[in-house]
Amino acid sequence: MILAMDTATPAVTAGVVRLEDVAVLAERVTVDARAHAEQLTPNVLAALADAGLTVNDLDAVVVGCGPGPFTGLRVGMATAAAYGHALGVPVHGVCSLDAIGVETRGDALVVTDARRREVYWARYRDGVRVDGPAVNAPADVPADAHAVAGSPEHAALFDLPRVSPVYPTASGLVRAVADWTAEPAPLVPLYLRRPDAKPSSVAR
């Protein structure tokens, strides 16, 4: 059983997925950009309860590593690492855009909110990333796709048919892992630019 989580977008996502057939046994999603820290652990516990499982039934964890805001990413990645350490199971990190794009078909553009009037984006062909991830103003994003997925507010800026999903899903996170048998790489946040939130400096 796989615990999947993502906090790279306003959606606080946690789900339990059976790896063999990528069946989602339970998924909890709270859309609140200010509640990542408050909602992630309750969503994890609720998803486990919905699935009739406990943490001891988990074989691995997958977490979206961005791109996304500094504070949101930190919550998801720290939580995933803590579960992995406590349970002694591997933790796989994936690009959060891939967790959306892997569930699209044809030539699809995926966009999420990067703030500062910009979007994070990547382009996919039948679920495989072929360009990006990158951060640009919407007008500077290559729009040579046939559809757009991701943040509804930002997808609306493109003259393309909109498709789902709008946020990373538990099944998408699991599908985005290239090789479940491989040793996972260390978790590295994908910011694509300097974080807005920085540790406060101490005056000397």
Regions found by a protein language model. Name each.
Residues M1-A23, A35-Q39, H92-R204:
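Oxyanion-binding and handling regions
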Residues A26-A33, C65-P69, R162:
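A short glycine/serine-rich beta->alpha loop
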Residues D32-A49:
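N-terminal phosphate-binding loop and adjacent alpha-helix
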Residues V44-A60, V141-H146:
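Phosphate/pyrophosphate-binding loops at sites that engage ATP/ADP/AMP, CoA/4′-phosphopantetheine
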Residues A51-N56, G84-V94:
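Phosphate-handling active-site elements
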Residues V62-V89:
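DPxDG-like acidic metal-binding loop motif
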